[in-house]
């Protein structure tokens, strides 16, 4: 059996390992931020939600989707997290046994924006009528 023998994932989405490692990184970062383990008063005054972490197939890059409470100060939060990238990586390596500590890249979590848009759509009168079956439905 060669080194590629364990590769059974052939789909286009993330593998189970990518999902599992991403979730472990998400939990670790959320815990570190909640406990204020990064000694930066500017960062600790922000209540940051770690929404999702997506890992590259080789697990060397982790894209961390974050949002400060209330959706304000997003750029400041990303800047502060990026500034403390090394310390955050250190916390991850202490919690997990990975061959490489992933490079952390911080991005705004737009899940909340999509959720607001979905709520807005569901409150639209036309959409509500269609959901209740009062609209004309096209049969395909």
Swiss-Prot record:
Q: Which SUPFAM superfamilies match?
A: Ribosome-binding factor A, RbfA
* Gene Ontology BP annotations: maturation of SSU-rRNA
UniProt superkingdom: Bacteria
Xref: Pfam families: RBFA
Q: Name one GO molecular function term.
A: ribosomal small subunit binding
Record's Gene3D superfamilies? 3.30.300.20
In which compartments does the protein localize?
A: Cytoplasm
> What do the Gene Ontology cellular component annotations say?
cytosol
Entry function? One of several proteins that assist in the late maturation steps of the functional core of the 30S ribosomal subunit. Associates with free 30S ribosomal subunits (but not with 30S subunits that are part of 70S ribosomes or polysomes). Required for efficient processing of 16S rRNA. May interact with the 5'-terminal helix region of 16S rRNA.
- The species is Cereibacter sphaeroides (strain ATCC 17023 / DSM 158 / JCM 6121 / CCUG 31486 / LMG 2827 / NBRC 12203 / NCIMB 8253 / ATH 2.4.1.) (Rhodobacter sphaeroides)
Q: Does the keyword Cytoplasm apply?
A: yes
Q: Which family does this protein fall into?
A: Belongs to the RbfA family.
Stored NCBIfam families: PRK00521.2-5, rbfA
What is the protein name given in its UniProt record? Ribosome-binding factor A
Taxonomy, top ranks, is: Bacteria, Pseudomonadati, Pseudomonadota, Alphaproteobacteria, Rhodobacterales
Main localization category: cytoplasm
Q: What PROSITE patterns does the record point to? A: RBFA
Keywords, A to Z, come to: Cytoplasm, Ribosome biogenesis
On subunit structure and binding partners, the annotation says: Monomer. Binds 30S ribosomal subunits, but not 50S ribosomal subunits or 70S ribosomes.
């Amino acid at each position: 059996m060669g080194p590629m023998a364990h590769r059974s994932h052939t789909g286009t989405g993330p593998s189970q390992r990518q999902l599992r490692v991403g979730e472990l990184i998400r939990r670790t970062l959320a815990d570190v931020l909640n406990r204020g383990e990064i000694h930066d008063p500017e960062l600790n005054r922000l209540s940051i939600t770690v929404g999702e972490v997506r890992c590259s197939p080789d697990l060397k890059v982790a894209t961390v989707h974050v949002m400060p409470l209330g959706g304000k100060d997003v750029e400041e939060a990303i800047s502060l997290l990026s500034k403390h990238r090394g310390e955050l990586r250190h916390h991850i390596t202490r919690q997990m046994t990975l061959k490489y500590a992933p490079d952390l890249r911080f991005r705004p979590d737009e899940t909340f924006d999509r959720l607001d848009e979905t709520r807005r759509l569901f409150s639209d009168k036309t959409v509500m009528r269609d959901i209740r079956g009062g609209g004309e439905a096209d049969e395909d």
